[in-house]
Regions:
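Membrane-proximal periplasmic segments of bacterial cell-envelope enzymes
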Residues: 1-354, 358, 363-418, 545, ...
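Beta-lactam-recognizing serine transpeptidase/beta-lactamase-like catalytic domain environment
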Residues: 78, 84, 130, 333-350, ...
Length: 862
């Protein structure tokens, strides 16, 4: 054995062993890699395949038809018709320049087809040129708060990846997005975009040339992309053109392979066959107005682009009518190719239609009522315009005309009107508003819709439920019945008009009196309740109101339903208010206008604060707003809680405690007198009670509340909630819900006092009543009861509010009618609409009352 072998042992064997170990390790490594490949290929391929499939499979929600709205006789007032829409879809993962260019060209080509066949894009872009400056500006809607506009802009920027920091102006956003979608407005701009690309990348490899388009086309294309971006989260197509003609459908489907992302879908469009009839009652549908509302509706299954009822029955009955809830939606699972075209349908679940809503309205009643109120308003307007230039009116109002502030208070003449017809269980048979509008125009959008929305007459307001006004003399049936029922007035008791009513005000320059001229006052002598109503004598009802007092008068008004909402199934009803201390100022509530029934408390509150602040400043004293507010509230509460005789003493105590006023100040007339006068404005007294008794003071009522009240007068004291929905019917015809009349109060007239009220109301259009000359030629003059109401708005009589209420037939009432015309000059002038309606309905009743002799056996009828 040589020295090497001694030192290293058997070297070849050692090398061989090491090589063997290396080979084994290498084999194990390859085995591990191979196993990984096998796992990837065999075990994970199913998962990756599923993931790939999920990007190609899309579930498209399907909706049926929105439910119909019909009148009481099943005449359709609102329905859905099937239409064709053009839709667009782009997968969110596709964002390369070449993809954008392909879709841009597809949008351009599709828009040409749509517009060539008379269609138009369903929306506009949120960036537009200002008409005043020509500069680019955002347009996120009008008539909403700044906070809402900011929220909309923020959401839009986020969805379109244009932050305010990087792209602060609308023009910055426009240019960036235009280039992103591969559009320019000129060849020069295209060169600039290319040059910028080369400067950034070093060469033009990979550069995708832009399409040269005009500005109008650019905005339309960007509008489509914008709408798609706002809709990306639900991965659904957007509708870019609605209700397109069949020519458009055919051309787009024929060119389907050349129009990536485009498709034709069947949808529904809301149609209102009667157009303007009962527009404010039916309402309309529209987009979900805010993201906040959509988040609420999303839980019910609504999609972002679904429509909802925005007003009227469409709104109040949304849950019944809608086809958009998850319970009624169907679905279609489809497979799309790389260009978002549907290549096959995987499954289909049929949607359900919404339910139908049957109203209590009768189309015939509604048609006659709408024509009647339109004619009446025009007639009043003509009368007012004639009076304005008549020598007598100008002479009678000469002093007032010379001193009136015409600039700040322009003359308001009749331009609106409401007419209501209810049956004896307060079911609405007609609810007519004038002027009205075409519901189809509003749903279609465009110039006609904008004209409706911007009309100064506020066409969409349902004045029957959404407006309040002083009722005037139509309130006198409350006072009269209350006086009789409470025993403060005997049925045969006579009250004579003695001129000025001085029980609460001995100053003849301001004391109230009847409307009749002094020379004719004898006509109002020796009046029972019957003549009091017939003549509408204010003095008579001052006395009745004084005897009743504030509390009982208010209680009877409440018993007739005049202090609460009517329960009608329509959105936007406001509550009537009747004069009382708590109506004038309720010390248990905050002073703010939203908490109180009138604006007077906040006016008094601010006046007291301003006065006391000035008093302090004149003496070098400053009061912070919190202390002034606390002091003003205490002073107002004190005025309600204590008699006037103790006001001054209590005022001084409050001023010293709240503001640390020295005795010299609180004993100063300059401090006390004005404060006293201010708090006196929110203190109820007898003078306010007697004004309430004739429908004045702070009493304001809605036409719908008046209609319920007149119905109760006509039917003998039964007060019902007002109903306008008769029933809910499924698409298959099953009655799901029936809205029966709900009796909320019965005045229990066991003494027959309503017979006296009816007799007095009969005399209004007969005998010597306030409207006799307007009804002298009416065939059924003795078969109705009525009451006029003229409520003063200001010193100009032309601006008076006019009311006319009636019921018929007198002996067996079937309908109660209310006519209200803001600035309608006089109640009697408002009677024309009721007269037109009754001239139509009495013959209809006569027809139905005819007894026909039926043939016997199998004989033929003559």
């Amino acid at each position: 054995m040589n020295q090497y072998q001694q030192d290293h042992g058997n070297a070849p064997e050692q090398v061989k062993g090491r090589f063997l170990v290396f080979v084994i390790i290498l084999i194990l490594m390859f085995a591990y890699l191979f196993a990984g490949l096998v796992n990837l290929q065999l075990k994970s391929s199913e998962g990756y395949s599923t993931k790939t499939e999920s990007t190609r499979l899309k579930t498209i929600p399907l909706t049926g038809k929105r439910g119909n709205i019909t009148d009481a006789n099943s005449v359709i007032l609102a329905t859905d018709e099937m239409v064709y829409n053009v839709t667009f879809y782009k997968d969110a993962s596709e964002s390369s320049s070449s993809v954008y260019k392909t879709y841009t060209q597809s949008i351009i080509d599709t828009l040409k087809i749509i517009e060539r066949n008379g269609g138009k894009l369903a929306f506009s872009y949120v960036i537009q040129r200002s008409e005043e400056t020509g500069e680019w500006e955002f347009s996120f809607g009008s008539g909403v708060s700044d906070a809402t506009l900011q929220t909309r802009e923020s959401q839009w920027r986020s969805n379109n990846y244009v932050t305010a920091k990087s792209y602060p102006t609308p023009e910055d956003c426009l240019v960036t997005l235009k280039h992103r979608y591969r559009m320019v407005n000129s060849a020069e701009e295209e060169e600039e975009v290319r040059a910028a690309y080369i400067e950034k990348r070093g060469d033009d490899s990979g550069y995708v040339p832009c399409i040269i388009v005009d500005e109008d086309t650019m905005l339309k294309v960007m509008a489509v992309f914008s709408e798609m971006q706002m809709n990306l989260y639900n991965s659904l197509p957007i509708t870019i053109a609605k209700n397109v003609p069949f020519e458009t459908v055919t051309e787009i489907e024929t060119k389907s392979m050349m129009l990536p992302g485009m498709d034709i879908s069947e949808s529904t469009q809301r149609v209102y066959p009667k157009q303007t009839l009962a527009a404010q009652v039916i309402g309309y549908i529209g987009k979900i107005p805010s993201r906040t509302m959509w988040l609420t509706l999303q839980a019910k299954g609504y999609s972002y682009n679904d429509t909802i009822g925005r007003d009227g029955i469409e709104s109040s009955m949304e849950d019944w009518l809608t086809q958009n809830s998850s319970l009624r939606k169907g679905s279609r699972v489809v497979e799309r190719n790389n260009w978002s075209k549907i290549v096959r349908e995987i499954s289909y679940t049929e949607p359900s239609d919404g339910n139908n809503v049957k109203l209590t309205l009768d189309v015939n009643y509604q048609t006659v009522a709408e024509r009647a109120i339109a004619s009446n308003v025009a007639r009043i307007r003509d009368k007012q315009e004639d009076l304005m230039v008549s020598s007598k009116w100008l002479e009678d109002n000469r002093t007032l005309i010379a001193t009136y502030d015409w600039e700040h208070y322009p003359l308001e003449l009749a331009e609106h009107g409401v007419m209501l017809v209810l049956d004896m269980q307060a079911r609405v048979l007609a609810m007519a508003n004038y002027p009205t509008y075409d519901l189809n125009a509003l749903v279609a959008g465009g110039d006609e819709a904008r004209a409706i929305l911007s009309d100064d007459r506020n066409l969409m307001l349902n004045y029957a439920i959404g407006s309040r006004a002083t009722p005037g003399s139509i309130f006198k049936m409350v006072t009269g019945f209350g006086a009789l029922d409470s025993g403060v007035l005997k049925p045969d008791e006579m009250i004579s008009d003695m001129g000025y009513y001085t029980a609460y005000n001995s100053d003849l320059s301001t004391a109230p009196k009847c409307w009749i001229s002094e020379g004719y006052r004898s006509q109002h002598y020796y009046q029972t309740i019957v003549e009091g109503l017939e003549h509408s004598c204010n003095y008579f009802f001052y006395e009745c109101g004084s005897r009743l007092g504030e509390t009982r008068l208010y209680q009877y008004a409440a018993a007739f339903g005049l202090t609460s909402k009517t329960g009608i199934d329509l959105p936007g009803e406001v509550r009537s208010v009747v004069g009382s201390q708590n109506t004038l100022y309720d010390p248990t509530k905050p002073v703010g206008e939203s908490s109180q029934d009138t604006s007077r408390p906040i006016i008094v509150f601010n006046s007291i604060k301003s006065h006391l602040k000035k008093c302090g400043e004149s003496r070098g004293m400053e009061y912070d707003d919190e202390r002034l507010s606390s002091c003003a509230k205490r002073l107002m509460d004190m005025a309600v809680a204590y008699p006037e005789s103790s006001w001054v003493e209590n005022m001084r105590t409050i001023l010293m405690e709240e503001l640390n006023m020295p005795r010299s100040m609180v004993y100063s007339n300059s401090v006390i007198t004005d404060t006293y006068n201010y708090i006196n404005d929110i203190k109820w007294g007898g003078s306010q009670t007697i004004l309430t008794a004739i429908g004045q003071s702070v009493t304001t009522v809605t036409p719908i509340a008046v209609a319920r009240y007149v119905t109760a007068v006509a039917n003998g004291g039964k007060v019902y909630n007002v109903s306008i929905v008769d029933s809910i019917i499924s698409p298959e015809g099953e009655v799901l819900s029936r809205r029966d009349p709900v009796l909320i109060n019965d005045l229990n007239d066991t003494n027959g006092y309503f017979n006296l009220i009816h007799k007095g109301m009969k005399g209004v259009t007969d005998d010597t009543g306030t409207a006799k000359r307007y009804w002298s030629d009416f065939k059924w003059q003795k078969k109705m009861g009525a009451k006029t109401g003229t409520a003063q708005v200001n010193q100009i009589d032309l601006e008076n509010n006019g009311w006319f209420v009636c019921f018929a037939p007198l002996d067996n009432p079937k309908v109660a009618i209310v006519v209200y015309v803001p600035h309608g000059y006089s109640g009697a002038m408002c009677s024309y609409a009721a007269k037109d309606f009754l001239n139509w309905i009495f013959p209809e009743w006569d027809k139905s009352d005819v007894d026909y002799d039926l043939p016997i056996g199998n004989s033929l009828a003559p």
